């Protein structure tokens, strides 16, 4: 029982470990609302091949200071201020800029104190409080002027962030006896801007070039009288827009780019004398959609307007003749074929014999044209008739009407091959019993005339041999029968069924199993 209890407690411990919650899930698991293991990167982002990011939200919490902390800072600030004033007073004989600042400050205070007593009450309460504080305190030590001089001239706060520069300027010019309320309001506004994230620069480091001035200069350039004439800055297009070569036909020409539909409207409105890209002929969809770099479509050059100027347009030359580019339309290709009568060449039906022993025995037999091509040519010729073109009759060759004529022509060709070059051989066992229609006496006379003496029923494996074979390509194992050239010996061709397929015909030392002659 004790062992079972320990195992049960151990499994419960593992179960509690597995159910441990993760403090924070990654962004991907948070969006998908799936469980995240909290690792960096987590297992699910690793399997999905994604970047695992844990976004931390910054919560603005006010600092909790202990009691008396603010009073302590105020006392410390007062001590540091008095110490700095004492140091400035002691270093005045040694530093010339301190003497100049103190002298200037005294003169300014004297000028402000004299008209302040005679002026009426100010409308602003802040200004009234500052004047009262100034009259009561008198001349203040020029500590703020010294700090401002060190910041601007000596680079006291050179490495601070840019957004804190205005805040330091406000703090440097702060005087609790003069501008307490105004300085506090300005610093609070600056703190809110810095918290949002908008950088605020100081007046001495504001950029000299104003972006609004650039816009106004560009507007003045567009509205200037010279904008009526040629100006590259006006006609220059952006990178995203297509570049079109603009060549004027007169002093007044359009300044924009037109679509093919607008170009057709511009042709109809010739009274406006606006430049049109298509004045010579209608263009097809392929020509209008294609980009011809050779024709100058991608060049942004613009020619200046001249009087009586006739230039090359995109689709015609100076004489107005159309220019056919590389991307000509399919309609022009069809018209080109329709204007010419096409007919298939007359193919050879019967083999041509040659008596020379060195040259080729048979000429190349061309295959008959397909019915599809003949129908296509016929449809083209039917389209030629209403157009008044000269009609030429198609010379269609005659086809072999029966299988017997093909057999006779093939046997005649094979007999000629055997008579001239002696290149016919039966490669299988052939006996006189397998050849009932073969006359041995005639075969002997035939072989004796050709200078062959090796004849017999069992000379080569018990078969009948006629010379050495000279086939460049072996016979197909699918042959069912071979035509034996016996037209000179008998009145009909002899067929020896020694192979296992169809009938092959030798054409230029190559086998054609489809009887394409």
UniProtKB/Swiss-Prot annotation:
Transmembrane segments: none
Reported function: Transcription factor that acts as a negative regulator of fluconazole resistance in C.albicans. Also confers fluconazole resistance in S.cerevisiae by activation of the PDR5 gene.
UniProt-annotated location(s): Nucleus
The protein's name in its UniProt record: Fluconazole resistance protein 1
DNA-binding residue intervals: 26-52
Gene: FCR1
Predominant location category: nucleus
GO molecular function: DNA binding; DNA-binding transcription factor activity; DNA-binding transcription factor activity, RNA polymerase II-specific; zinc ion binding
Natural source organism: Candida albicans
Gene3D superfamilies referenced in this protein's UniProt entry, alphabetically: Zn(2)-C6 fungal-type DNA-binding domain
Biased composition (Basic residues): 388-398
One GO CC annotation: nucleus
Zinc listed as a keyword: yes
GO biological process, any: regulation of DNA-templated transcription
């Amino acid at each position: 029982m004790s062992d079972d209890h320990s195992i049960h407690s151990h499994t419960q411990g593992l179960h509690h470990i597995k159910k441990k919650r993760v403090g924070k899930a990654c962004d991907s698991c948070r969006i998908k609302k799936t469980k995240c293991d909290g690792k960096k990167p987590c297992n699910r982002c690793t399997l999905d091949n994604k970047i695992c990011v844990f976004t931390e939200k910054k919560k603005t919490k006010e600092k909790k200071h202990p009691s008396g902390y603010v009073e302590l800072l105020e006392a410390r600030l007062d001590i540091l201020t008095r110490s700095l004033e004492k140091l400035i007073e002691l270093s005045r004989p040694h530093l010339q800029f301190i003497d100049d600042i103190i002298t200037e400050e005294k003169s300014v205070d004297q000028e402000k104190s004299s008209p302040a007593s005679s002026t009426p009450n100010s409308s602003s309460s802040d200004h009234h409080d500052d004047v009262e504080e100034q009259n009561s305190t008198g001349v203040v030590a020029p500590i703020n002027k010294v700090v401002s001089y060190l910041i601007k001239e000596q680079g006291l706060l050179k490495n601070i962030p840019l957004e804190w520069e205005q805040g330091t300027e406000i703090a440097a010019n702060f005087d609790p006896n003069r501008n307490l309320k105004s300085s506090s309001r300005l610093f609070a506004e600056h703190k809110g801007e810095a918290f949002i994230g908008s950088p605020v620069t100081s007046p001495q480091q504001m950029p000299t070039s104003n972006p609004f001035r650039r816009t106004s200069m560009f507007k003045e350039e567009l509205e200037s009288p010279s904008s009526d004439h040629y100006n590259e800055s006006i006609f220059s297009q952006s990178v995203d827009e297509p570049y079109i070569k603009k060549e004027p036909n007169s002093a007044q020409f359009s300044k924009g780019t037109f679509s093919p539909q607008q170009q057709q409207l511009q042709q109809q409105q010739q009274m406006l004398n606006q430049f049109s890209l298509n004045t010579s002929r209608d263009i097809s969809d392929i020509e209008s959609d294609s980009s011809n770099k050779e024709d100058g479509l991608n060049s942004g050059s613009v020619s200046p307007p001249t009087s009586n100027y006739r230039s090359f347009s995109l689709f015609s030359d100076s004489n107005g003749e159309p220019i056919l580019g590389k991307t000509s339309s399919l309609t022009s290709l069809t018209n080109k074929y329709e204007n010419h009568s096409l007919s298939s060449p007359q193919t050879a039906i019967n083999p041509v014999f040659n008596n020379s022993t060195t040259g080729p025995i048979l000429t190349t037999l061309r295959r008959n044209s397909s019915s599809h091509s003949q129908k296509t040519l016929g449809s083209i010729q039917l389209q030629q008739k209403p157009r008044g073109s000269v009609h030429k009759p198609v010379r269609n060759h005659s086809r072999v009407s029966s299988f017997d004529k093909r057999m006779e022509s093939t046997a005649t060709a094979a007999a000629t091959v055997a008579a001239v070059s002696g290149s016919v051989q039966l490669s299988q066992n052939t006996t006189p019993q397998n050849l009932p229609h073969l006359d041995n006496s005639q075969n002997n006379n035939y072989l004796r005339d050709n200078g062959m003496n090796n004849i017999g029923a069992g000379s080569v494996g018990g078969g009948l041999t006629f010379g050495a074979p000279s086939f460049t390509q072996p016979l197909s194992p699918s042959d069912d029968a071979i035509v034996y050239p016996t037209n000179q010996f008998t009145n009909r061709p002899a067929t020896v069924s020694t192979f296992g397929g169809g009938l092959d015909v030798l054409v230029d030392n190559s086998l054609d199993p489809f009887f394409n002659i």
